């Protein structure tokens, strides 16, 4: 039997061989086979990476922004050259279907190029003074050393979402990928190494959140920690960062409501909601997790939803190109979805499609629809993170908005209607960072991806995401 490849970390411009005894197996969720091993890194490894980033930061910040942008463009070009290789890694370690993996890789390169365009666009201000002969100058400065803690659901893109704005604005960064999907991050580090990015500007540490992640959040040399993951993990990161009053940027869970009005285009709504639920096997924090349908079209909508969900094909994405879903990421994720559905049934919900894990190898859960659901049920409040759609009927828009807002989460929401007045009323009433009207829940790189309530602090993308990596210095100049 062949020994799985053992990956090194990337610290201070070089790949570092792991001399520890503990390794973490990386498992293909479609087959349950071990495909690689990574170091079970410790706090000391994270400290070395942070120290390297600290040494590199002043010289990196001193470069003109346009020069920093040129390095980003080199990384983007390297990604495009290795796109097939990287997408194959994402499919293998994450269970993502081939088409979605290819889109993720292409979007990552485009995102880095987009952030590079901001080199000449972010700016300070000159403010009018009340004093004769005085100028008030407002500068936008880098934070210093930043860290990024990544999830497993869009692992490659999340490197760019944290790295690109950080580097463009003069910061250095230490990235920790999820231990479930580290192989694509190793490929990213190889590109960084091949283009000759200055040492210490980008570092990659491997390990678990409770060891490496905690050091990345709690080290006093870190100016900001950006983390994408669960609410529970975010709470730990925030508590650790608070000891040094370190800035945090957190994108956490979601329980996105989709509201379907009587006048909605039913075919459009069904397609968008199904696309938003089965993408990445339902493991997307901003996609529809609960559906509210106005009573006038409830039966018609539910029938079409059932037909569309039943038509969704799933299987091993390394072997099939005709599928919309692969497996869930691991056994724990599969068990969680099973438990959520079982509890909903205990509380009175009725399974009309799916509802049971697929027997055999791989962590597969079929597209599932729950009816006879009530707002107070746990399935309407707890994040499922699987291809499960609970459906609730409502009378009025006000009732739907009230139920949608009845959540600890506030990341995304959506509404389907052909009435502009209804859409505008919903926009004003929905308490979510993002609202999608008559479309699926996928954000744009020039927007701003930010959650309310327990869905996070701060945000990413566009001008406002870029400014998360900047701090303000005000100079009062008396002439």
Predicted regions and their residues:
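Residue-level signal for inorganic ion chemistry
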Residues: 32, 68, 90, 112, ...
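Glycine-rich loop-to-alpha-helix module at the N-terminal edge of alpha/beta enzyme cores
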Residues: 33-122, 133
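Short, well-ordered beta-strand elements within core beta-sheets of diverse protein domains
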Residues: 35-41, 56-62, 147-148, 258-261, ...
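Structural signal for hydrophobic packing residues in well-ordered secondary-structure cores
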Residues: 57, 61, 76-83, 87, ...
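Rossmann-like NAD(P) dinucleotide-binding subdomain of oxidoreductase/dehydrogenase enzymes
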Residues: 124-268, 322, 394
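ALDH superfamily catalytic-core signature
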Residues: 232-374, 403, 437
